Regions:
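Short intrinsically disordered terminal tails
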Residues: 1, 80-81
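Surface-exposed ligand/attachment interfaces on beta-rich extracellular proteins
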Residues: 1-19
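Beta-sandwich interaction modules
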Residues: 14, 47-58
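Noncatalytic modules at the cell exterior or secretory-pathway interfaces
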Residues: 18-23, 56-71
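Short, surface-exposed beta-strand/strand-loop-strand elements in extracellular ectodomains
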Residues: 26-42
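Edge beta-strands of jelly-roll/beta-sandwich modules across compartments, strongly enriched
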Residues: 31-33, 69-79
């Protein structure tokens, strides 16, 4: 298992993982899921609260994150299998 912390900000989507993983949000954020490695400018994500977790159960599914609280930088903890 690989554990990593990914910094996200409010300006653009950041790729969190494309592996089977457990993702924990360390600040209020948006999450976007896609089956291709492309995010359009008008993509809308799910609202995720600080401490909320998401399980990505399939390799090849791209999970992106973006901060929901202005320009503050937040992080996401990702544990990839």
């Amino acid at each position: 298992m690989i554990n990593k912390r990914v910094l996200i900000n409010s300006d653009s989507w950041t790729l969190l993982t494309d592996k089977t993983s457990l993702i924990q949000f360390n600040g209020d954020a948006y999450m976007y899921i896609n089956d291709v490695a492309v995010v359009s400018a008008d993509s809308v994500g799910f609202t995720m609260a600080k401490g909320e977790k998401y399980v990505s159960s399939t390799n090849g599914v791209y999970v992106y994150g973006k901060s929901a609280s202005g320009a503050d930088v937040h992080s996401v903890t990702v544990s990839e299998v």
